[in-house]
C-alpha cells in the first residue's frame, strides 16, 4: 500500500482503525502487524548488538554503523527471523509498517523478495511511504529503485 510520505500520520491512524475493524468484523482472520523498526530493534537486542551499535555510531558515525549492520541484517538471516518471531505461517494476512524508519538498513525490495520464498502466496501488505508504479518503488518519492517486484498496488 503506497501512500504519500506526508500522509504518514493519517496512515498510522487508519491502520489502527483497520486492525480494530478486522478484529471486530472478521475475527476468524489471523492478522499480524509487523513494525519493521521494532522488529529490527528486537532482532539486534536478541543478538546483543544494541550497545555495540550505539557505541559504533558514536565513535565512527552512521555510515560505519550501516556498513557493520549489513551482515547481521542480511535478508538470509532477517527474513527467516521475521517469519519465526511473528509466526507468519500461522497468519492469514501479514501487515508490515515502518519501512521509512528502517531505511537504509533494510530495503523494501530485498525484504519482499526474501519473504516471497518463505511465505509463498500469503498476502503481505507493505505500508510504503512513497510510490509504486507496478514495476519500481520510490521511497519517500525521492529514492528511486529499478527493481522488479511481484507486487501490485492495493488501491490504484
Spans of model-derived segments:
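N-terminal, charge-rich interaction modules
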Residues: 1-48
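Short acidic, S/G/P-rich loop/turn micro-motifs used as interaction or catalytic elements
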Residues: 5-10, 39-40, 68-75, 100-104, ...
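Long, charge-dense
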Residues: 30-75
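A short, acidic, amphipathic alpha-helical segment used as a generic capping/interface helix at domain edges
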Residues: 74-88
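Conserved P-loop NTPase "ATPase switch" module shared by AAA+ and STAND
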Residues: 89-105
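Conserved Walker B catalytic segment
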Residues: 103-119
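Short, flexible loop segments at boundaries between secondary-structure elements
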Residues: 117-139
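C-terminal functional extensions of proteins
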Residues: 133-156
